[in-house]
């Protein structure tokens, strides 16, 4: 519903490679997306590479965002300031999955014309099944063709 194309061959960036980010990357890759995942620690970056995704240091996001079509944020801290949002093409979709304060300012993203969807606070630790079902709904909603 959010895209007019499927996720197949779509350039996606996932910010954070914890429980939610790593699960999301696996599912996006299974749908044929070109997945870049970001993390802070070298061990996480190595795991991203070993899992078959393109790793990116979260402090060096600019190149990964150039031409990116969908950004999923799982980091509950401001990691997408305005200067990085400006790297995204105008038709990009930003999906906020992290709890407050989230990764970017929704008002700034929307003022720039980006499509911003807020789906924060997935309770992965308290209710992993429910969190997984909700995340599945978000993912299933993305690859549909626009009618």
Describe the residue ranges of each PLM region.
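NAD(P)-binding Rossmann-fold cofactor-contacting core
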Residues: 30-51
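Residues in the short beta-alpha loop(s) of Rossmann-like NAD(P)-binding domains
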Residues: 18, 40-42, 100
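Short glycine/serine/threonine-rich phosphate/pyrophosphate-binding segments
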Residues: 20-24, 45-48, 102-103
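Rossmann-like adenosine-cofactor binding region
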Residues: 48-123
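Glycine-rich adenosine-cofactor-binding loop
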Residues: 8-29
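Adenosine-phosphate binding glycine-rich loop
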Residues: 1-9, 103-147
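Accessory recognition modules or surfaces
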Residues: 1-12, 44-53, 70-72
